[in-house]
């Protein structure tokens, strides 16, 4: 099936060259297990589980039935000063899978939102301890940490940052550990050992008591 430009016009796709995509659109119409299927019937291996959020696969009847059962009860219960029992049950189950000490669960909708939330937790944690001056975050060049403003600021991918202004203040990037001269080296490389101390270098430069977290 061919779609004209008018049909494709209104959806502004994220992380995509919209003009190029709409000139030659590739649309998925269904999924089953680890595969997705295009409108032409082409089978595509979903090797990244969607955006890492379909780990159980596509078109699982038991998941669809559970979602439908919940939608018949309530489509959404806001979590601000209110909740519903299944949220607590899910948090309890997740906490049984995590290491000791990591037993409080905060639900978010995406990895990008998780990074934003983690930064807020770090800010609030240090503020509560009387160390509100800890407002600097250390990340790494070429890192990717999401599409929200906090994630873009932490990310070290130039093309993902250059059109979005200065970003969140107080973000410092460690140098990337990949060096061209080490690409074919076997064993311990002879160059780049100083990069292992980059976090310490940054801490000493700005002051260890100004750093809120290191994001890796």
Where are these regions (language model features)?
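Short coil/turn connectors at secondary-structure junctions
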Residues: 40, 100-103, 132-135, 149, ...
């Amino acid at each position: 099936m061919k779609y004209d430009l008018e049909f494709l016009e209104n959806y502004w796709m994220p992380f995509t060259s919209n003009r190029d995509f709409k000139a030659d659109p590739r649309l998925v119409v269904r999924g089953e297990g680890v595969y997705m299927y295009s409108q032409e019937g082409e089978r595509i291996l979903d090797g990244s589980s969607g955006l890492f959020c379909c780990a159980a696969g596509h078109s699982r009847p038991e998941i669809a039935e559970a979602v439908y059962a919940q939608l018949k009860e309530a489509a959404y219960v806001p979590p601000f000063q209110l909740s519903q029992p299944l949220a607590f049950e899910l948090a309890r189950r997740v906490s049984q899978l995590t290491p000791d000490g990591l037993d409080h669960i905060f639900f978010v909708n995406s990895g990008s939102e998780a990074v934003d939330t983690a930064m807020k937790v770090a800010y609030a944690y240090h503020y509560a301890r009387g160390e509100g001056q800890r407002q600097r975050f250390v990340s790494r060049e070429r890192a990717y940490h999401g599409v929200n403003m906090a994630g873009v600021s932490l990310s070290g991918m130039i093309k993902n940052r250059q059109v979005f202004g200065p970003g969140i203040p107080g973000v410092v990037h460690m140098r990337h550990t990949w060096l061209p001269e080490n690409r074919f080296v076997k064993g311990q490389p002879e160059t780049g050992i100083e990069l292992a101390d980059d976090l310490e270098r940054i801490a000493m430069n700005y002051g260890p008591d100004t750093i809120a977290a290191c994001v890796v």
